[in-house]
């Protein structure tokens, strides 16, 4: 018994796929627990920085490969070990609502390792002694994904998200063979669209 996002049709396949996504999140939580247990068992838990993040949104109609929040907003968890002083800005249990781009992660890990961020690097450290002022905007783009060419650009601020679609008329049901096999809602949406639903 699940409630998919409102931009999906109310259909058994949609509910099944959404339940599968929620189950995968639970499974990921269990797997992270296994890794943490192994670090403790190996005696290195208090010496290991843990950074967990997603690289793209969910495999869904507005997720992976799209410039919408469901395709860009990804989880990130950072755990600092007991045997090292925490970097400036880090606090265990902190939920951070700053605008952070994944390009900032490389700059941040360099600073946390005591290294300099190269001047041409676009990322901004969000933790540590070299932490910069809060990023005002994060930018994203989409062009060709497999055989699907849909151009989008977006700007995400703390409060608003602007998405510009340069390919009107080409939407979520557009053919993409990779997603056809992995995401059963995609062919369903194309079928419903063809039927005028």
Language-model features and meaning:
Residues 141-148:
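Glycine-rich phosphate/pyrophosphate-binding beta-alpha loops
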Residues 61, 148-150:
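Short beta-strand-initiation
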Residues 62-65, 129-133:
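Substrate-binding cleft/loops of secretory-pathway carbohydrate-active enzymes
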Residues 124-129, 135-141:
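Polar, glycine-rich mid-to-C-terminal structural blocks
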